[in-house]
Amino acid sequence: MKNILSLILLLLSVSVFGQKIPVMQKKSTGKEIHIDVYSAFQKKAPMLKASQFVEDIEFVPLETTDDCILDEFINKIVVTKDYIFAHDYNSCYRFDRKGKFLNKIGAKGNGPGEYTKAMSISIDTINKWVYMSDNWQHKLVKYDYSGKHLGDIKHKISDARNIYLYKPSQLLVESMFYHFAKKGERFCFNFYSEKENRVLSRMSCDYPLIPKKMVSVAPIAYNYKGDLRVKDFWCDTIYRVVDPYHLESHVIIDRGKFERYKTDNKALTTGKLDPRHRMVLGISRIEETDRYILMVSRQGGIVHDKKTGTTHTGGINDNRSCVMEDLYGSPGIRSDHFPSCVQGNEYYTFRHAYEFMEEGNGKHTVTDARYDAFRKMVKGLKADDNPVFMIVKLKK
């Protein structure tokens, strides 16, 4: 009798709590953009030059105050019509588009409205909400633009890190350790509904030969024209999110003889290239504009021109820069922040104030009043000032 009762309870729990979460269906459109990165890297330049794809750059020093001192590494920049949001793992800082500091959002701690560590942010521009992902406590912490705490959203995604807004109250949540799961149970993204407080669907990882020696792997998501684009860490296809249940192929990356990672990329911590990864492609960031698809990889930076069908590549220098800024001669674009945030035909990044002072007068092609304004800006910087925000205006 005891065994029968246990079986009934088990069946009830499966029917109530064990309902299968749908897997997002992938569809091939036959209209994919093909990017032959292997052939492009056979003609790799020492570094990409900004003048190859950049029209102009606007430099905006972010205001430094006693309440606003950003950390050395800015994890994420989000730009809206009126504001700049900068997230440095400790907090989120809101500036106006001219760099004036407005307010801080969020605080570390264990109390109400606090987080242990905010791994990522996502901005809802319609409702003016800010989400922070605290994967230590398995929750999203929600604020308004002024920093007022609006509530905590508990979830059961144990390895959640980066979050991406799909539509108001619908978020795509990245998984960091899905490669440790069994074959057929590896899901790199979870589509989460705040209103329903549940995962609506999941994106599967179909690559069969995943090594478990790696600590974590990170899938990629970015927004283009209001649509999310996603790429699994191991897959060479970028998909467009049609709805929470369907994906359409958008870009196919032809890796040629380039390999996939078999062990962790220790260069991220040591700063030295691992000889075992000499032939690893390892794409870590992707963004897209009307004309360009921008990527950075273990091999260097990639700029694919959708208009001409050409692909330019360049290496990464000792200062971790992958794009030489030859318009104004500024410190260049960091490989760990290229590309990071794109809106329309603008790409947003930053360099620290002290880097502008250390760089001196670099080679530049802009010689008019814009360059004079740039030099005046540099002379007004102090070494311990907050970073300089860069609005990179791409060619159309």
State each model region's role.
Residues 66, 106-114, 154-161, 205-210, ...:
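Short coil/turn segments at the loop-to-beta-strand junctions that recur within blades
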Residues 72-76, 116-121, 158-166, 211-219, ...:
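Repeated scaffold domains used in trafficking and secretory/extracellular systems
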Residues 22, 34-36, 83-88, 128-134, ...:
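Short beta-strand elements that form the blades of beta-propeller/WD-repeat-like
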Residues 20-61:
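Blade/loop signatures of beta-propeller domains
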Residues 250-275, 308-344, 357:
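Conserved blade-ending motifs and adjacent loop-strand segments that build the rim/top face
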Residues 1-31, 77, 129:
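Bacterial Sec-dependent N-terminal signal peptides
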Residues 63-75, 94, 100-127, 134-135:
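Blade-loop segments of beta-propeller domains
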Residues 116-118, 133-186, 200-210:
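Asp-box/WD-like beta-propeller blade repeats and closely related beta-sheet repeat scaffolds
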